């Protein structure tokens, strides 16, 4: 036993039991009196620093924290802000359809950045500029894969501002396991490279906002830490407050250095599918159908059902969102709302070919690097769109289908140097037999997209 004790050493500094005055044992670890004294010194110095009596803190803990920095970019000016029609034209290049939602977002974003430029001019002494302009956050309602996130991303790209995406399902009320709402601001700050001024002019998109709806219309009598509790925690951030953001993320704790961010200039865009919301609207209107939505869905195509659901949501009122599960205070902080329509087969075909980064163009570019000219027959484009519409996941289904179709082609074509041109046909889409690189009879006569 004496021989075993001689090999005991501190788990932190590595000194043996003979080199220190005291060695304290824990469950599988040991710590010496010198390491304990060092820990006490670190805690005492940080405590004094937090009270403002000293600016000396332990150097290692300072080095681990990213520091906020001042912005080198000027605030936007009225002349530099694109007009609503210019914003919509830019959105048209990336997002197919959704004209009503594009118009709503273009005007809302234009007014938001006009407000920032107006405040940045330093002319607040006159009677005209003394009027305070409040921001208008945006609520996007639409089925999955209809372009909600892409709209927000395209806006941020055009305006050259930091853009962060957060998932509402990961947020919990303070004091519970999960992410604090302040972590959303940390993501925006990281996108701005820790530039606070730039982050305060950014855009935050909170996805799956419908998933934090409370379970019933009545206020909860028990803790709903990932539903109503998160809505309550988001209220001040959406309205505008100075939030303390921990630079390393995670939970805040006393004496922790935080970065202060003013959220009054941050544009919040919340999006969600809100499945079943059309039923709430119909119930409010007092009947199972409102003239164009028969109660018996037999015999109706899915395209007609989706179109009719979108028509129902045009009659949406704030009370319907309250009945769905959002609290009135939360709805009041999202004054601008836009309903996105589900994508039909025609829109899905356009998504495949028209946008700047369309899937067809991407795969053509990839195969052109192997000196192969790839073509998609018109009926193949139609078949892909039909399959994507059947899968009910919107535009997201397109990439999955095309990836499945092109897998074997992308594997074989680079090795077959004799093949200079290849056309994807409808039969290949329907049977997913694109793996065999065979000459297609009459391929050159096929009308291609």
Curated annotation (Swiss-Prot):
Zn(2+) binds at residues 10, 13, 32, 35. PROSITE patterns: CLPX_ZB (PS51902). One of its GO terms (cellular component) is HslUV protease complex. Residues 50-83 are annotated as: Disordered. Pfam families: AAA_2, ClpB_D2-small, zf-C4_ClpX. ATP-dependent specificity component of the Clp protease. It directs the protease to specific substrates. Can perform chaperone functions in the absence of ClpP. This is ATP-dependent Clp protease ATP-binding subunit ClpX. It comes from Synechococcus sp. (strain CC9605). The lineage of its organism: Bacteria, Bacillati, Cyanobacteriota, Cyanophyceae, Synechococcales.
């Amino acid at each position: 036993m004496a021989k075993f004790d001689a090999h005991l050493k501190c788990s932190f500094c590595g000194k043996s039991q003979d080199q220190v005055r005291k060695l304290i044992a824990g469950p599988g670890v040991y710590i010496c009196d010198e390491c304990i004294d060092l820990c006490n010194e670190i805690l005492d110095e940080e405590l004094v620093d937090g009270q403002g009596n000293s600016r000396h803190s332990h150097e290692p803990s300072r080095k681990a924290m990213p520091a906020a920095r001042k912005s080198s970019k000027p605030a936007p000016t009225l002349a530099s802000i694109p007009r609503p029609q210019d914003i919509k034209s830019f959105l048209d290049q990336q997002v197919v359809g959704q004209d009503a939602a594009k118009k709503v977002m273009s005007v809302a974003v234009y007014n938001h950045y006009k407000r920032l430029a107006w405040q940045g001019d330093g002319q607040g002494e006159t009677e005209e500029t003394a009027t305070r302009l409040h921001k208008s956050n945006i609520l996007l309602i639409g089925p999955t894969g209809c372009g909600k996130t892409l709209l927000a991303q395209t806006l941020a790209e055009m305006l050259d501002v930091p853009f962060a995406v957060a998932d509402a399902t990961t947020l919990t009320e303070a004091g519970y396991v999960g992410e604090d709402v302040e972590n959303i601001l940390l993501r925006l700050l990281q996108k701005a490279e820790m530039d606070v001024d730039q982050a305060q002019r950014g855009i935050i998109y909170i996805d799956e906002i419908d998933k934090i709806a409370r379970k019933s219309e009545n206020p909860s009598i028990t803790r709903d830490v990932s539903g109503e509790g998160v809505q309550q925690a988001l209220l001040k951030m959406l309205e505008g407050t100075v939030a303390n953001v921990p630079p390393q993320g995670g939970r805040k704790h006393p004496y922790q250095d935080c970065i202060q961010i003013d959220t009054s200039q941050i544009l919040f865009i919340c999006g969600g599918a809100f499945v079943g919301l059309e039923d709430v609207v119909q119930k409010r209107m007092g009947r199972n159908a409102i003239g164009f939505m028969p109660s018996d869905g037999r015999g109706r195509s899915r395209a007609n059902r989706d179109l009719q659901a979108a028509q129902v949501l045009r009659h949406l009122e704030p009370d319907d969102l309250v009945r769905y599960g959002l609290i009135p205070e939360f709805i009041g902080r999202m004054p601008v709302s836009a309903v996105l329509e589900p994508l039909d087969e025609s829109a899905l075909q356009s998504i495949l070919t028209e946008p700047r980064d369309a899937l067809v163009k991407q795969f053509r570019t990839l195969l052109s690097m192997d000196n192969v000219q790839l073509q998609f027959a018109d009926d193949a484009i139609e078949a892909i769109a039909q399959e994507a519409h059947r899968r009910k996941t919107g535009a997201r289904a397109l990439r999955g289908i095309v990836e499945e179709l092109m897998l074997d082609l992308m594997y074989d074509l680079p090795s077959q140097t004799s093949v200079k041109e290849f056309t994807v046909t409808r039969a290949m889409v329907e049977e997913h037999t694109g793996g065999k690189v065979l000459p297609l009879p009459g391929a050159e006569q096929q009308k291609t997209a």
